[in-house]
Amino acid sequence: MAQFTESMDVPDMGRRQFMNLLAFGTVTGVALGALYPLVKYFIPPSGGAVGGGTTAKDKLGNNVKVSKFLESHNAGDRVLVQGLKGDPTYIVVESKEAIRDYGINAVCTHLGCVVPWNAAENKFKCPCHGSQYDETGKVIRGPAPLSLALCHATVQDDNIVLTPWTETDFRTGEKPWWV
């Protein structure tokens, strides 16, 4: 029978501890690396505005400058920007000098399609299932069960800042469903 020599077959404790720590560190690093994007997904992005608001962004991701915005749009225009939580939001041009004090979330309340503005008919029409909303985003024809969500739109330092709308919905006189 072969003779067993302890010194050749069993590594010393220092080496064993080192290998255990190396394995633990590798597994921990991989686990943290995999969890980081998941945790980051649940943390809302910062819009750079004060008071919980988000600065409106154009399709390229740049801040919308009100002075240039009003020069290039006419009264009554509804223009898509990136708004609260990254949702597409319409900014309503009131005149060549001002925007309305609210923005309209462009996500249909039926199945989540982006609802385009139809200037010829003066209403929003969902391309997915035909829901229609008036110029303020109030539902006028289903299957959408609710009006489009609102947000406050204010001008600060030539930027459009969007903040959550928590007051009574002026279109329905009811508490907002999106709060």
From Swiss-Prot:
Keyword list, A-Z: 2Fe-2S, Disulfide bond, Electron transport, Iron, Iron-sulfur, Membrane, Metal-binding, Thylakoid, Translocase, Transmembrane, Transmembrane helix, Transport
EC category: translocase
Main localization category: membrane
Entry's Gene Ontology BP terms: photosynthesis
PROSITE patterns in alphabetical order: RIESKE (PS51296)
GO molecular function, one term: monooxygenase activity
Annotated Rieske domain residues: 61-162
Membrane topology category: Single-pass membrane protein
Keyword Cytoplasm: no
Signal peptide (residue range): none
Enzyme Commission number, as recorded: 7.1.1.6
Catalytically driven reaction(s): 2 oxidized [plastocyanin] + a plastoquinol + 2 H(+)(in) = 2 reduced [plastocyanin] + a plastoquinone + 4 H(+)(out)
Family: Belongs to the Rieske iron-sulfur protein family.
More about this protein: The Rieske iron-sulfur protein is a high potential 2Fe-2S protein.
Protein's UniProt name: Cytochrome b6-f complex iron-sulfur subunit
